[in-house]
Amino acid sequence: YFEAMLEAPDMAFLGVRGLLMQAIRRDDTREALRLANQADVLRPGTPWVLSKLFELQAGAQQWEAANKTLLQGSGAKNAQTGRRRRAVVALALSEEAAASGDHKQAIKQARAACELDSHLIPALAAHVRHLAAAGQMRKAAKTLLAAWARNPHPDLAAAFGALGGPDEAPLDRVKRFQSLYKARPDDIESRLALAEASLAAS
């Protein structure tokens, strides 16, 4: 039925939509991606098509394509969702760059993810990790302390702990964690992070 609709120019889009929904229901990602791209060619910029295309591309870890889809307008109906999605894509691109040894691109994409969504903890932790991997330890610590002051989180405490390296003396670690505590002394996460560092030193 849907295949027959493809033959009529005025019905082709509806036919592609029907086939796309069938492909999604049977978990045929490759076919669903092909059909979503075809739907976008037939009616460029259709919000539901772009949203579905993004979801499929992200699920297949096609981050460059997902980024292009987002720039084309996915998430435009909800600006916050659009920014969050773009942040997630930037984070994924950051991790890909890091895996290939491109620290500069990894830092750039992680920073972009943080700018798009300052509450995306994995992006903040990745930004710090990539700065440290590039030997920018002071900048990594400064970035993390600023993020901690806004939004204390156990994953940020773990990233801060990793900045000391495996050979850091326990008392030096406690001193470093005191600066984390001072960035947000009123928060329970600050007290927990300092307590854990102190316990490890005793």
Ranges and model annotations:
Residues 1-202:
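Repeat-based scaffolding regions
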